[in-house]
């Protein structure tokens, strides 16, 4: 699964998942914690992260939503996603 970004100990990844049941989303990992966020709108759809890390991921995703959606489309068409800048 390609790593799109990494910041503050959080790793952002995205799977290539095809089919109408798979809404655009990404996975955020921190240690043993994992959360899945939808892209439109940016919202937690599964799992959990500690509150501070969840806020960081949500802020980052809001800033990078168009890039995340573009990477989702790249993956679904069989193309490698592009890296996305982390939070400063």
Where are the predicted features?
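Basic nucleic-acid-binding interfaces
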Residues: 1-88
């Amino acid at each position: 699964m390609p790593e799109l970004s990494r910041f503050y100990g959080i790793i952002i990844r995205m799977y290539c998942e095809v089919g109408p049941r798979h809404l655009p989303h990404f996975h955020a990992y921190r240690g043993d914690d994992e959360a899945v966020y939808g892209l439109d709108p940016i919202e937690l759809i599964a799992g959990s992260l500690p509150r501070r890390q969840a806020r960081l991921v949500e802020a980052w995703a809001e800033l990078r939503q168009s890039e995340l959606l573009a990477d989702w489309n790249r993956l679904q068409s069989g193309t490698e996603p592009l890296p996305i800048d982390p939070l400063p």
